[in-house]
Structures are given as structure tokens and as C-alpha cells.
């Protein structure tokens, strides 16, 4: 009788632990992953369509100088190119790599049909497709893009 009660208790505990694990998921990082994906999408759409003021709400406070720098390098020739583009830039989220501490992540995206800033004094040029890795971190409980420089495209491996 005692063995039956202990066995029943063990089954009940296992069921409760399984339920708790299922309900909480196996999330090993902080913050809301949906919020992260939505905000990286919004940031990238605004950034790669050169709407820099709209990107601020998706970035850490320390990122603001980089956005101001990007905006200060826009010239009339760049604006004219933006206006003549047939389509806006679009993005795809390829991967999200969370750090071991769960408070930082690197998001891999592919950007299509965007104007790439060139060196200072040169006109921007149209790029059909490029990959970027954007760092993110938790700020006040919310995922934010953490700019430590302007986003630079990664080289593609064309094996």
C-alpha cells in the first residue's frame, strides 16, 4: 500500500513537472522572442530605407550617435536615388543566436534591394542582396539593437 502511494506521488510529481516545463517552454534567454523579431524587422526596414529617425525606438541609447552619423552622411544625390527606386528594401530574418547569458543575441538578416552608403563623399549604390549580423541586448526588459558601428554587410560564401 505504501509502495502504491509513493508510486502514485512520483507519477503526480512527474506530471506536474512535465506540465510546468511544457508551459514555460525551453526558453533559455530573456525577453520576448516575438518582440525581438518584430523589432528587428521594423528597425531593418526603416534603417535600410534610410528612415533613420524611426529606428531610434528600436535601438539602445548608446546607438543614437551611430544613427546620427549615418543621417549626417546623407546627401541630395542619395535622396534623389532613394526617390527613384522602384521598390523599398525588404528583409528576411535568417537566424537568431542567443548568447549563453541570454541577455544578448546576434540576428542574421538578408536585406534585398537597398541603397548602400559608400565612402564619405561618394554616392550610394544599389545592392540587390546582402547579409548582415545585428547585435541585440536587453534594455529595460526589452530587446534593442545595440549598434557598435554602422551595419556592414557580411561576405557571402559562394562555394
Segments from the language model and where they lie:
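Exposed beta-sheet edge and beta->alpha loop/turn motif
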Residues: 98-159
